[in-house]
Design a protein with these regions (language model features):
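All-alpha RGS (Regulator of G-protein Signaling) helical domain and cognate RGS-like helical scaffolds
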Residues: 2-210
Length: 210
């Protein structure tokens, strides 16, 4: 992967971090107008914040695992950028729940806010679309070098696809403007990273699993 591509990823992550504080403040006023109506616990806004915080936490975990399993600087830098960006966004989502006075957990199944109440229970710890199973996480921890790189890129590609599905749901259903904008930003950034990871897999003689 070229230095230009790596620079783009790093720049994107930095831009998200710089914008984080402004978005967190803006959600209280929702763009500078009158204060937005506080979402309730069963709203799409609250459901997305709760579920995406969990989804992001796994991406952070996978990224730090692969950084310990390979010395490849391209993969290590991408993993670091993903971990930092998603950890920051996770903090914002949990912060909004605090701001709204809402619980960070719900008795409802994951994805209920998207109208997916009938979704079957997650298999082997994979609670939401794109999430890796516990077995897959253990496998990632057991691999080294190129094998770890390929498996991480495959897992993260699927993770991003699931995340995009969820973020598109918020962009459509959420009411808080700042949260809708953050969700759309996730869609755009993660789609670009999927394309980037496809190229990295090709360089390693591999391809996405789906």
């Amino acid at each position: 992967m070229s230095g230009r591509s790596l620079g783009w990823v790093a720049g994107t992550a930095a831009a998200v971090l710089v914008a984080a504080g402004a978005i967190t403040y803006a959600v209280a006023q929702d763009g500078g107008g009158p204060p937005a109506r506080t979402p309730d616990a069963k709203s799409a806004d609250a459901g997305f914040a709760r579920d995406m915080a969990v989804h992001h936490q796994q991406a952070v975990e996978m990224s730090y695992i692969v950084r310990d399993r390979t010395k490849d600087e391209e993969v290590r830098r991408l993993a670091y950028d993903i971990a930092q960006t998603q950890a920051n966004q996770r903090g914002m989502l949990l912060g909004w729940l605090d701001l709204w006075g809402l619980p960070k957990v719900s008795a409802d199944p994951p994805m209920t806010w998207m109208g997916m109440r009938g979704m079957p229970p997650g298999e082997d710890g994979a609670l939401m679309p794109g999430m890796a199973t516990n077995t897959e996480l253990k496998k990632l921890q057991s691999l080294d070098g190129k094998q770890a790189e390929v498996f991480y890129l495959q897992l993260m590609t699927e993770h991003h696809k699931g995340g995009i599905h969820m973020a598109e749901g918020c962009a459509d259903k959420c009411a808080v403007g700042a949260e809708k904008r953050l969700a759309q930003g996730m869609v755009d950034a993660q789609q670009s990273e999927i394309e980037l990871m496809a190229g990295m897999l090709k360089e390693r003689g591999a391809h996405p699993r789906s």
